[in-house]
Amino acid sequence: MFLGPLMLDIAGTTLTETDRVQLSHPLVGGVILFARNYESPAQLSELTASIHALRSPPLLIAVDQEGGRVQRFRDGFTRLPPMRTLGEIQDRNPDLSLHLARQIGYVLAAELKACGVDVSFTPVLDLDCEQSSVIGDRAFYREPQVVAELAHALMSGLQSVGMVAVGKHFPGHGAIQADTHVETAIDSRNYTDIEKKDLTPFRRMIDTGLSGIMAAHVIYPAIDPNPAGFSSKWLQDILRNELGFRGCIFSDDLCMQAARNYGSITHRAEQALQAGCNMVLICNDPDSADELLTSLQWEFSAVDTARLEHMRGQQTVHSMAQLHEMERFIRATEEISRISLANISVSV
């Protein structure tokens, strides 16, 4: 059995029989976890083991574990700062900010891998334009070159323990106020402006080995009337052909309000996959997931399968308890805990 193109969610902290049936469907290739699925590292490890045991090859398990307000697993995990904190440290001490970005990437990945989670949808590559409340302090910085440097450092930390990175939200969500979770989002800039600014972090990260990209549900009417995640112009012509990206393309959640204007859930999934997504997310809408599993017809290619398999990264051999005895991990978590805008006491 291959990994299918759908990533679904589950309701609770353990698998129900309904979950097992859904996740065993050949169209499914992954599971995204939320805060409601988490109680403790031990419980999470049991949950991920049960998900991985359902299929061969195992389903891909993902989470949004960025830091700051977007950190699904908190108690028992290291509290990670919002990425804007690294940008503010960069203004004072660029070398320190890069060091801390690597440390955050390492700790983030080490803890998730220890609990059986394959990938986090991070880093955010959107610019901090002080326009978007939904992005806000999730972004590293206002200048694209600095975003690229900090994101690359964080990716290096992830990769040091076998986790790949997923940059988001292509081609850039930082310059608009609208929140795609609840409304349509339109960016009226021309391609030249977007290419010079927003695409720079994506281009730099692609050139240095970025494995995954998540597309935005944002409309850029000067380029294409469809949102980027439904646009072959963005995903094929620009991302694949112009920027040379060869990794895995994820949609954002197809049940977000900005995506619901594009027909039934089946039509949305078909449009996103035809545009160039390798995997589409269906979250917080069990009825839509059921409908899609019944109605979607999709032939998955060997290239798609290879791209999804690569997102698994390398498996860790360390448990959470073992991590807490490792000198590298102890030092990294101590440094992260001392991050303060007023008093940076970490030495590189």
Swiss-Prot record:
Q: Which reaction does it catalyse?
A: Hydrolysis of terminal non-reducing N-acetyl-D-hexosamine residues in N-acetyl-beta-D-hexosaminides
Q: What is this protein called?
A: Beta-hexosaminidase
Which residues are tagged with the site Important for catalytic activity?
D179
Pfam families attached here? Glyco_hydro_3
Q: Which GO terms describe its molecular function?
A: beta-N-acetylhexosaminidase activity
The entry's localization annotation reads: Cytoplasm
Record carries keyword Cell wall biogenesis/degradation = yes
HAMAP family cross-referenced by the UniProt entry:
NagZ
Q: Keyword Calcium on this protein?
A: no
**Which processes are annotated in GO (biological process)?**
carbohydrate metabolic process; cell division; cell wall organization; peptidoglycan biosynthetic process; peptidoglycan turnover; regulation of cell shape
List residues binding substrate: D64, R72, R138, K168, H169
Top-rank taxon of the source lineage equals Bacteria
Please provide the record's keywords in A-Z order.
Cell cycle, Cell division, Cell shape, Cell wall biogenesis/degradation, Cytoplasm, Glycosidase, Hydrolase, Peptidoglycan synthesis
Organism of derivation:
Nitrosomonas eutropha (strain DSM 101675 / C91 / Nm57)
Report the active site residues.
Answer: H181 (proton donor/acceptor), D252 (nucleophile)
Q: What is its EC number?
A: 3.2.1.52
One GO cellular component term of this record is: cytoplasm
UniProt family annotation: Belongs to the glycosyl hydrolase 3 family. NagZ subfamily.
Q: Report the function annotation for this chain.
A: Plays a role in peptidoglycan recycling by cleaving the terminal beta-1,4-linked N-acetylglucosamine (GlcNAc) from peptide-linked peptidoglycan fragments, giving rise to free GlcNAc, anhydro-N-acetylmuramic acid and anhydro-N-acetylmuramic acid-linked peptides.
Q: Which SUPFAM superfamilies match?
A: (Trans)glycosidases
Q: What class of enzyme is it?
A: hydrolase
Q: In which pathway does it act?
A: Cell wall biogenesis; peptidoglycan recycling
